Amino acid sequence: MAMRAIQQIMLGTVSRTEAEAAETLKRIKNAGYDGIELNGFMIRPTPLIVRYLTKMAGMPVGRGGKFNWKRLVSEAGLSVTGIHTDLGGLEREPENIISEAKKYDTDKLIITGMYRFDYSNKDKVKTLAKRLNDAGKRMKEEGITLCYHNHNAEFLKVDGKRSVMDILIEETEASNLGFEADTYWAAEAGVDTIGFLEKLRGRIKLYHINDRGTKLSKPTFTPLLKSDSMELGYGNMPLERLTEIVLSENVDAVILESHKNWPEKSPLLSMEMSAEFMKKYVR
């Protein structure tokens, strides 16, 4: 059975102190979730630039880098499904990242895309594929599965036909690199989400789930509305079918990541609303 989990990025505004983080994790457990996916930049001291960029994106990470997350997660009765990290850090200090993964009893490390990177440059994308393949081979020696997590940049066409994602799939070995599929970002890029998962069959290790749609609180002046993150089952994505596909792939975890647009600006209320879908379809 796949774990029902939460992405730590949702918790920045409700983990301002260690005591608050403990209460937040207990509430997550009580809502029916089994695990949490951690971010390296949230369990280590967080650089100012990271706090600034995530805040500007509507996802403040807080100052929890000094908290004892190992104890907090364990006391809440949750398991760690994996740790998000960056490729450069993994290449420079593999021993430290490996040690961190083992400390949290997880065998999954996830590369969350590239920053200050030209996704339109085919040669650079091909080099990225090689770097991921090499890093994954190194992690495999330690009993760790390396995964790549997509956003929307990976659906950019780099040669008129193939997308960045196509190259990452085709030019890496399945034994060295798995994928943490995120269909919200595929939908945002205009991609057929079901077709995307079908293309990844055999390599999906983790699944990020989110819904996409529109919330209205008052009449609008025009019929042009902005889509955004939604609680599971409240938007327009074919989540039942998408979940069916990833469960047939025996993913280790289905991980909720609602970025923002939360009811009453509360990520906890949002995750509790999404828990109803998770309990019904992720089992």
Placement of each model-derived feature along the sequence:
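Glycine-rich, proline-tolerant flexible connector loops at the mouths of alpha/beta enzymes
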Residues: 37-68
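Active-site acidic/histidine proton-transfer and metal-coordination neighborhood
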Residues: 79, 84-178, 268
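Solvent-exposed loop/turn segments at secondary-structure junctions
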Residues: 11-13, 43, 85-88, 115-117, ...
